[in-house]
Curated annotation (Swiss-Prot):
One of its GO terms (cellular component) is cytosol. It comes from Shewanella woodyi (strain ATCC 51908 / MS32). This is UPF0434 protein Swoo_1821. Belongs to the UPF0434 family. It holds the Pfam family Trm112p.
């Protein structure tokens, strides 16, 4: 199952409530403000702070 990009209109970072960006290659949602990456498992975003990984822009 793939991630539905329409979800980006309604989901937000659980930490700062900011906008999330989709990283298709890594299957993650990125919060650039908090520098966190949230995994997407089987097309479902896991928006739990304890599941987020540190993110750095390439």
């Amino acid at each position: 199952m793939s991630f539905d990009k329409k979800l980006l209109e309604i989901v937000a970072c659980p930490v700062c409530k900011g906008k999330l960006d989709y990283d298709k290659a890594k299957q993650q949602l990125i919060c650039k403000l908090d520098r966190l990456a949230y995994p997407i498992n089987d097309g479902i975003p896991v928006l739990l702070e304890n599941k987020a990984e540190s993110w750095e822009e390439a």
